[in-house]
Structures are given as C-alpha cells and as structure tokens.
C-alpha cells in the first residue's frame, strides 16, 4: 500500500501540487496534480492509496491537463470539435482522454459547431466577401457536418452574395484597365469563381457590366495592345504582319471589327 507523506505547492503554479509518497522504502516524489484533482480525490497527508486508486488519480490528472490545454487553445478564438481533437492529437494525447475532454467541452458549451458555423459564415461573408462555395469548403475542412453548414449558410442570402460580388467586381476591374472588355469579364469571372460564388450569381453580376462598357477605355486598351504588337511583329511584311497582329489582338478579346478599324487607322498613319 502506498501512503501520501507530504503535499506541497509548486513554486511556479499555486494551482499545482507535488505529492510525495512512501511505498515502504522511505519518502519519494510520487506525482503532481492540479488543485481540482487534489480536491476530487481528497488527497491528504497520511492517505493510503492502492494501485487502482493511483491509476484513477493519474488518469484524471491527464484528462484535466488536456482539458486545460484545450481551454487555452479556445481562448484565442472559437474552434470546432474536430479542431480541438486535432490539436490534442498533436499534443500526443490518447484517444480515450480526447473523447472525455471533448465531451466535457461540449457539456460546458465551450465548443458548439452550430454556433461556430454561423459565426464563420458571417465573418467570411461580411469581412472577407467570400462566396458560399469557399465558405462551405472551409467549414468542411474544419469537420463541420454538411447539414449544419447548409443551415448556417441561410445567414448568407443571395441578395448579400450579389452585393459582395458586385463590390469585388468594382474593386478589381480597376486593375484591368488595359484589358479588352471581353478579357476583363473573363478575368472577373475567374476571380469570382475562386472566391466561391455560384455560376448564376456571377452571370447576373457580370451582365450588369454590359451597361457600364466604356468605349473610350476599350479604345485605349486596343491602342495599347495594338501598338505593342505592331512593334513585336514589325519584322514581318504584308499579310503575315497583319495576320499576326490580328490573331494576337483577337486572343486579347477584341472583336474583328475593332481590330480592322485599328489596322486601317495605322495604315493611314503611314
């Protein structure tokens, strides 16, 4: 039988205690526990403990240690159930202890995937202007159930998606001033797909660009690229020269009519 001979507070933490024991060969350091474990098991000087009781004490101490690690991890931001499990596995915590810790965290409402998903959707839509597809993918990667994700995305109605998509279009199109209107639309389309917006939202938003088409900007872009290709292919003569310029400008999204007008203007310039 093991007897507790001394209990002393650790110097670095007043909530942890060193337990000294005697197994019949004199006093020795036995183990350390958190204050809650000390009180839960009624540990005190002179208490006799057998191997089974000692095993329970040490197991509960490991659970408490992992629980406090999880609480510390949660103190920075909300986490999902899977994120807590992954965090504890990296700390080399056993699965039985992880299950017990997660169960306690759920009971104490420190983790709640439904609340997490709603908060995540609001942040990603309002702050980062992410589309629902990217948001869903992000939540799935954090272990949130598909049904919970679908419910949480109700916080992100189509009207808000379109508002965000139009905001991104307005913000990004300024960087495509030297592109043809068609090429600008293609690049904006690609950007919105990467951001996670659905095809129908993208089409509706890009349709609004038709009314905003800037002919002056289109001409500036045509002249910018046209003059560049004029220089690039000037070593060629006649039909070969014009054909290469036409193909290059067509790939940039300019219409045949626009290209022909540009080439005619260049001929007149001499």
Curated annotation (Swiss-Prot):
Disulfide bonds: none annotated. It is found in: Cytoplasm. The keyword Repressor does not apply. Coiled coil: none annotated. It holds the Pfam family RecX_HTH3. The keyword Cytoplasm applies. Keywords: Cytoplasm. It comes from the Bacteria. Its main location: cytoplasm. One of its GO terms (cellular component) is cytoplasm. GO terms for biological process: regulation of DNA repair. Belongs to the RecX family. HAMAP family: RecX (MF_01114). Modulates RecA activity. This is Regulatory protein RecX. It comes from Bacillus mycoides (strain KBAB4).
